Design a protein with these regions (language model features):
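Conserved phosphate-binding/catalytic loop of the ribokinase/pfkB sugar-kinase fold
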Residues: 54, 76-81, 91-128, 133
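Active-site-proximal loop->helix
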Residues: 59-71, 89-93, 97, 115
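Conserved phosphate/ATP/ADP-binding segment of small-molecule kinases
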Residues: 144-215
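Short beta->alpha connector loops
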Residues: 57-58, 134-138, 158-162
Length: 215
């Protein structure tokens, strides 16, 4: 359950700076969004995946649906909106693999708790529910509560937010931030080891901090 959008990937030598123009080395456009990427990743590893997301009825939305079908991701619960475009993200990637992202939510921002209630059948037979705070955190929390009600484990990828609701420590079986996200959520904790220790102290059962080019 999460965001599905079109990503514009832009390769640059160095970070953007206010008032300066930098050359783009390469540009590519492809389906993305943390929810979509998780779904496709699991499918490529041989897992059976169904996704709930919100798209616009437009070219970008059709492109995303085609991509998911090609990768054997179930889309029968997708929500299609006539008057709101599909979301779009602009990702600036440096040579060291570090990145910065600007996001237009579009239809992703319309996903709501009622949509989850009407699609609870997605939890039937599921082992894990993959969530990200790229969608509204309140909606993600509601999804996690429903997952728990159906006996489904929750994996949370925090992003975009500066604060995680305290309830996540009870709902998330596995927390997977990258080191920058972890540092933003835990000011003053700069190493993955200290971040993991602090998340554990706050009640999280299993924490995996990813480290960009360092793995």
């Amino acid at each position: 359950i999460g965001a599905a959008n079109i990503d514009t990937l832009i390769s640059v030598d160095k970070p953007l700076e206010v008032g300066k123009t930098i050359a783009i080395k390469h540009r590519s456009i492809m389906p993305g969004g943390k929810g979509l990427n998780q779904a496709v990743g699991v499918a490529k590893l041989g897992g059976a995946v169904r996704m709930l997301a919100s798209l616009g009825r437009d070219y970008d939305g059709h492109r995303i649906m085609d991509y998911l079908h090609e990768n054997r991701v179930g889309t029968d619960a997708f929500l299609i909106h006539d008057n709101t475009p599909t979301g779009h993200a602009y990702i600036y990637i440096q040579e060291n693999a570090e990145s910065s992202i600007s996001v237009y939510d579009g239809a992703n921002g319309l996903l709501c708790a009622d949509d989850l209630e009407q699609n609870q059948h997605l939890f039937d037979g599921a082992s894990y529910c993959l969530l990200q705070t790229e969608i509204d955190q309140g909606v993600a929390l509601h999804a996690a509560r429903l997952a728990k009600r159906h006996g489904v484990k929750v994996i949370l990828k925090p992003c975009v937010v500066d604060v995680l609701d305290q309830e996540w420590s009870e709902l998330a079986d596995i927390l997977v931030p990258n080191r920058k996200e972890a540092g933003k959520l835990l000011p003053g904790y700069v190493t993955p080891e200290s971040q993991i220790a602090e998340f554990s102290r706050r009640g999280y059962q299993t924490v995996i901090v990813t480290c960009g080019e360092d793995g």
